[in-house]
């Protein structure tokens, strides 16, 4: 084997053995690697289990057994081994530093291969780093931007990457290079894009830009031109890669090769619609990076920068409601849950920027097949853009001197009453409360967090703190989720004894696996509500997690007496009795749970565990099958394996049931 083909990582070595059919050798290698790294313990355990299954199959072969299903079982074992190897790869790759080609080399290669998306992506990712570029790298970038063979979308993407780079690490030399691109002797398109980038950097690094000698005279012009240029910047950033990708995809859909599998007209249109709604992440990765910058993550700016389109905004909703025959694709685009709001915004901009001839071609091709595709552009795009920009600048208040930026474009045809709740000037407690309640009802959790936090500075009430916690717990921001527990603890200190607060505080501790604190909170809640069956059930569950099974059963029986037939109490009782080995009583309660309408998959898995404890394998398999997903049942047994052994179930019985489920899973496929 040549040196360059020699496998270097554990995954490559395992994969080579699996390809050659050396299952035993591959499993041994996985086990050895997992034994050396404690973080791979769970993968090692699964490898040992797989090894035992393989040994058992070899024993059958050694006895001369010629079961035709042995080959199927071998294929299943091989598939499991591949999944195990992939898990090992996923666990090890993040710990290794990827090889990165120097940016100077990438730029030189880009001049030779201007249409290479791969090179462009690598340059974009490396420019996202905060380090300053060397003189040679800046020179190579200069050559790439001025090269006549570089397509416009590549130039726009490079400038977008430079913008991202400068927002994170101010580089005076790079900024001055940008200024040279704005001079009259440069191509018009490059002048415009460079000005846009310069304005964007100026808004973030105001205190640095105004002291650069070459830019001092232009600084006032930059400030005055910011609204229009920032508008162009967003279009450029969102379109630079997205339009090109759209173009390739559309041509593939419309001008399909006869050699490829022919799609029906309906499938073509459906594919086109799905493509629009799924979003183009390559362009918008810049916006994701910008969220890390303090300027854009500030409470007053982050919402409108990254969520410009939302059905709850009165102006956007009004556009769609104006015309009862609103465009199907635009409505679907706005209502799509698969796309973030900025993706939707970028898709609108891209479609608006499309060449009329291309739009006519799309319409003509689809009409030939009897499909109408009229009115491709969304209604009143300028109205949409005007409202978005008005809210953006009014909300961000980004003028260097602290004055709200105004522009004639923002003033035309605006119904200010629709946007009162968005105004940055809202400070009266009554107005804040109405705004917060509106955002809470519309489930705009990030904005609700900010508004409730502001409201607490004026007045501290139990309801406000509870709603702040609820908004934080539903927010996509991880920092808000971390603060949610602290907010709830503070609420409990200021307003002790509230059942809602104590219940949610206990749930938060349970999710964090802080069972001791959860127990303390539940005991406090029971002092105020001694006979509440829900609190008793939660306390029983908490005690079970702490291995205080006898106390848990006593509490759960008390809860069952308080509210006869409560489903969750019966489920927890069945689980606790199962752990004590009391199969008869556990079976009684699990039957009550499974007799209810639509029991969950977890209920059937627990029922299967209890049946196994009673050595009733057919009943256990019947219950596992009722999860309607053999993989889910198999994983449930695998994750509960220690629990099953602790409950007195023999390991060979567990293994047998898992093998039977795997066999049925394979037959089902």
Q: Residue locations for each model-derived region?
A:
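Start-of-helix register in tetratricopeptide repeats
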Residues: 8, 193, 430, 463-467, ...
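Structural motif corresponding to the intra-repeat A-B loop/turn of tetratricopeptide repeats
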Residues: 20, 442, 475-479, 512, ...
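Short coil turns that delineate tetratricopeptide repeat
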Residues: 38, 460, 496, 530, ...
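Alpha-solenoid helical-repeat scaffolds
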Residues: 311-500, 504-507
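Canonical positions in the second alpha-helix
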Residues: 455, 490-491, 524-525, 558-559, ...
